[in-house]
Amino acid sequence: MMMHSSACDCEASLCETLRGFSAKHPDSVIYQTSLMSALLSGVYEGDTTIADLLAHGDFGLGTFNELDGEMIAFSSQVYQLRADGSARAAKPEQKTPFAVMTWFQPQYRKTFDAPVSRQQIHDVIDQQIPSDNLFCALRIDGNFRHAHTRTVPRQTPPYRAMTDVLDDQPVFRFNQREGVLVGFRTPQHMQGINVAGYHEHFITDDRQGGGHLLDYQLESGVLTFGEIHKLMIDLPADSAFLQANLHPSNLDAAIRSVEN
């Protein structure tokens, strides 16, 4: 009996240790709410809150209900990048129709002491993680020679398709600014579910401005990144999503036009 009790105590202790380790070191999983193709077709309202997102990760990007600006999240802080170029901390009760989150656990680090282009940074990542069949999360902290961004203006019903909305997109250029870049590289076979290729958002170091990145050049800074093998998607059940055309014939071209 004594030996059995001791074995049980050891097993319970081991289980508790493993639970504690898992809590501190969660799996690298991409959590996503809704689909990019739904956003593209005008599904701009969701029930997922910022608080919900932070239960699934400390790092990510997306947008807000009514397409009211871009979202950037890092170090468990979430910001709303608005159509006037300003930024503000998001409220826990705000909701999103589309967002992507993960627990950021980079496996690689690269320091840049001389100017590099967006493409050169992507080349570094692609050389380290050559398979296009894996997800990748990336972050840059540094001085940006320039960051060319856009944001999306808030919409009201009846909602237009995103390709029409972005005819009116405001664009901004941040020159010689310290800031943070948050991004994902998504496999090409995921186009429509997510945004294939690189998708990156930017916020200034004073947390006062930023947006969806169209282009940038890094003066100096630190790139951290890592691969991700798991994906979890929460699909909406509302009528707007259920009736949306999620696979139009021009899906790939439409996503590339709104993202680039």
Curated annotation (Swiss-Prot):
It comes from the Bacteria. Keywords: Acetoin biosynthesis, Decarboxylase, Lyase. Its EC number is 4.1.1.5. One of its GO terms (molecular function) is acetolactate decarboxylase activity. One of its GO terms (biological process) is acetoin biosynthetic process. The keyword Cell wall biogenesis/degradation does not apply. InterPro entries: Acetolactate_a_deCO2ase. CDD domains: acetolactate_decarboxylase. It holds the Pfam family AAL_decarboxy. It catalyses: (2S)-2-acetolactate + H(+) = (R)-acetoin + CO2. Pathway: Polyol metabolism; (R,R)-butane-2,3-diol biosynthesis; (R,R)-butane-2,3-diol from pyruvate: step 2/3. Converts acetolactate into acetoin, which can be excreted by the cells. This may be a mechanism for controlling the internal pH of cells in the stationary stage. PANTHER family: ALPHA-ACETOLACTATE DECARBOXYLASE. Belongs to the alpha-acetolactate decarboxylase family. This is Alpha-acetolactate decarboxylase. It comes from Klebsiella aerogenes (Enterobacter aerogenes). The gene is budA.
